[in-house]
């Protein structure tokens, strides 16, 4: 991948989040409006419009929502709930948005970790965010290995992508959860003044 392509992708993600922030301002007076509410509203309005374009793949809002619902239902089955924090260490790709959106649907805060972070720095970010678990791309397992000795306490680790011995894999064949949208009441305790994600 050349530098121009990489910068273009980063800018696209930046614009995506700027649009979310811009839209959320119009909902400031509504106590229980969250970014997940806004995104689900857009899904319902334009389900067949393209939401994500990545390399040679395109995903409609309906498809994006279904993938996110699968993550949300997986997290529910694992016992995660509003107020919990999960760290996400993954390259910029559609699965990143699916995972983040899915967790936001049930009120889980995502600690977005830079995929260049390793060793003590990675362990520090996980500790600082008070993450209960880590979802990591299989291509970034070396990052985790370099931080393992510095991570305090128990940290549940789920791997997205290829199978890695000793870890639970987070992919379609392993998740096998419903793509039906979870009830928004699962995040009703949230307000739009609470943290959606942390960025490290």
Give residue spans per PLM region.
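Conserved pre-ATP/AMP-binding loop-to-beta segment of ANL
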Residues: 47, 165, 177-200
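AMP-dependent adenylate-forming
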Residues: 12-23, 37-60, 196
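Residues at the C-termini of beta-strands that transition into short coil/loop
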Residues: 56, 62, 158-162, 171, ...
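Structural core segment of the AMP-binding/adenylate-forming
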Residues: 1-6, 77-78, 105-173
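Residue-level signature of the cytosolic catalytic core of signaling kinases
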Residues: 31-35, 136, 166, 191
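Conserved AMP-binding/adenylate-forming core of the ANL superfamily
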Residues: 27-32, 36, 48-93, 97-101, ...
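Flexible, non-catalytic linker and terminal segments flanking ANL/adenylate-forming cores
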Residues: 1-32
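Short hydrophobic segments within beta-strands
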Residues: 53, 89, 135, 198-199
């Amino acid at each position: 991948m050349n530098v121009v392509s990489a910068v273009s992708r980063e800018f696209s993600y930046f614009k995506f989040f700027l649009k979310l922030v811009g839209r959320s301002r119009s909902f400031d007076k509504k106590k229980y409006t969250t970014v997940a509410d806004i995104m689900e509203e857009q899904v319902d309005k334009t389900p067949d419009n393209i939401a994500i374009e990545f390399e040679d793949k395109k995903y409609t809002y309906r498809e994006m929502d279904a993938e996110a619902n699968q993550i949300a239902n997986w997290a529910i089955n694992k016992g995660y709930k509003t107020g919990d924090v999960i760290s996400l260490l993954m390259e910029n790709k559609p699965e990143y948005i699916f995972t983040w959106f899915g967790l936001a649907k049930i009120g889980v805060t995502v600690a977005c970790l830079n995929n260049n972070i390793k060793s003590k720095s990675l362990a520090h970010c996980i500790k600082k965010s008070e993450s209960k678990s880590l979802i990591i791309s299989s291509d970034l397992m070396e990052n985790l290995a370099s931080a393992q000795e510095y991570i305090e306490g128990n940290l549940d680790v789920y791997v997205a992508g290829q199978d890695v011995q000793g870890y639970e894999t987070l992919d379609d064949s392993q998740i096998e959860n419903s793509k039906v949208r979870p009830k928004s009441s699962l995040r009703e305790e949230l307000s739009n003044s609470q943290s959606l994600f942390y960025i490290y």
